[in-house]
Amino acid sequence: MSTLYLERSVADGRRGDWTEELDLSGVDRIVVGTGPGSFAGVRAAIAFAQGYALGRPSCEVFGLPSPCALAGDGRVAVVGDARRGLFWVALFDGFRQNGDVFLSDAESLPSAVPDGFRVVTTDEARIGESLRGVFGPRYTGGGTPTGEGLRRFAEANPAALVREPLPIYLTPAVRPAAD
C-alpha cells in the first residue's frame, strides 16, 4: 500500500507547479490533517485528496486531527490559539487521542489539561509565553504538525483514521441575519 502524506501551505504558492514534482502513481491512500487550523488550508487539503481519489476507485482518503502529528511521546496536551480569548485542546496518551478536540477559555485552561500531561502548542509565537506562565515546566514549547507526524500516528493507530474526512469546526457556523 502506498500512502501519500504531503505538507504544503499557502506560503508555498498557489500556482500548483509543485504538483509536477509528485509521483502519484501507485498511491492508494491519502491521509490529510483535518484541523484545527487554517480554514481554507484544511478544506483545500481535503478537496485535493478527494479530487485526486475521485477517478481512482482503489484510492481511499482518510483524515486525522492535525494535533495527532505532535502526539506519540507519552501523555501530551496540544494547545492552540482558537482566537477570541479561547484555546483549543487535544489530549493524547501516546498514539491514542483522549476524546475530541475541545475549546477552553483562559480561566479554565489549567484544569482542562490533566496533571501528568506535558503541554505543547502549534502557536508558539502567539501563545507560548502565556502557556509557559500557566503550565510552567510542563510546557515544553512549540511544534508544527507535519505529514511525517501524521504518518507516524496513522501507522501506530490505524483505527484512528477517519474515512471521508471533514474539517474540524470548533464553533458553529454563523448564519447571516435575515433582512
Where are these regions (language model features)?
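DPxDG-like acidic metal-binding loop motif
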Residues: R29-E60
